[in-house]
């Protein structure tokens, strides 16, 4: 099965099972620029099931690191209005949120942890509406894996760049039950049903 076909199946799974995108619903995607192929395929799949709009927020880890290296500690206490408005408004519009976890795990190595914590606290406060609606499951959200070169090289240090990247993608596809014979959406539906059955049986025993 080609990489393109695997990516299509993965994106379909994300849209239909991970986010359960509804007709006329807005989808907000956050990802690094390296994950553009997955972002494009998720966008296509979302529109196929009737999404109203797909909004993409890209980041660049090199730019992000330069930001932390050069900005003052107190600057991370201020969240731009556009940033909080973006998250809060889309949450109030009942959008669903996809986060593609594809960053180099050592992207912020050596950065002053105070800067990072300042930004996290400031965002939590400024985007309270967004976090409240996510925490109580009003808004659907999902975190999925995406392969990037630096992450792949970290996981498979003895391989060439392309071999490492291919291996990481294959590991992600395998974890998501992407194969040639089965529909991953149906497989995950069966998995969910079996899990729900176990939970119900356990609850009956406890009662």
Task: Spell out what each predicted region is.
Residues 1-207:
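Active-site bordering "gate/hinge" segments
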């Amino acid at each position: 099965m080609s990489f393109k076909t695997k990516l299509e199946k993965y994106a379909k799974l994300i849209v239909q099972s991970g986010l359960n995108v509804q007709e006329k619903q807005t989808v907000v995607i956050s990802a690094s620029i390296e994950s553009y192929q997955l972002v494009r395929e998720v966008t296509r799949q979302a529109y196929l099931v009737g999404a109203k709009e797909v909004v993409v927020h890209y980041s660049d880890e090199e730019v992000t690191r330069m930001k932390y290296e050069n900005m003052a500690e107190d600057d991370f206490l201020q969240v731009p209005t556009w940033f909080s408005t973006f998250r809060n408004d889309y949450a109030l519009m009942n959008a669903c949120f996809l986060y593609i976890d594809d960053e180099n795990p050592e992207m912020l190595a050596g950065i002053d942890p105070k800067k990072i914590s300042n930004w996290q606290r400031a965002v939590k406060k400024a985007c309270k509406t967004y976090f409240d609606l996510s925490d109580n499951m009003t808004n659907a959200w999902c975190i999925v894996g995406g392969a990037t070169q630096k992450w792949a090289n970290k996981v498979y240090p003895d391989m060439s760049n392309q071999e490492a990247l291919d291996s990481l993608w294959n590991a992600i596809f395998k974890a998501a039950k992407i194969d040639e014979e089965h529909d991953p959406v149906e497989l995950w539906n069966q998995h969910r049903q079996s899990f729900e059955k176990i939970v119900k049986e356990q609850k009956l025993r406890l009662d």
